[in-house]
Amino acid sequence: MKKWLYIIPLILIIIIWQASQIYLGSMSYQKKEENKAIAFAKENVKELSSITDAKYYHGRLAYTILYGTNEKDEELIIWVPNSKKGRLIVKKASEGWSKEKVKKYIIANQNPLKLIDIRLGAEVIKDNRTNKTETTPLWEITYIDQEKRYTYYFMKFTDGSFVKRYSLKKDRFEEEN
């Protein structure tokens, strides 16, 4: 019986240690990607004077979204692709919809039960009229809709126009009371 008093805490310590190693490993990978994106942006975006924040987006392609300013102290948003398949996109924040404007639009027009997340991203979008594809900066909005489905709504960063929406079955994400 005394063996179990030593074995159980030892097993718990090993589990906690391994879980922390996995977590730290994944966070160091994300930090490494962020540092690569910052270095790439500093090298390729001449008007960039400072970087204030970095976020990660993973759609069809992964992007690191950098927030910064130029020499004129105008806010910049830089979409840095995490692979060679994507393309670098640089926009002034004033060229597109703000997060607050997106939030107001979604609440007014989609009437979500719960707004979960609003984040910038980029997707390759095909124009059916011209048959051309283009990497487009967009907003990804995640919310619970009126039918209690987990919903992703995508709209263009520049003008707020609808890109796509998809919802996951409600029984997969229903909260238990």
Predicted regions and their residues:
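Long, terminal "pre-/pro-" and other extracytoplasmic accessory regions
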Residues: 1-177
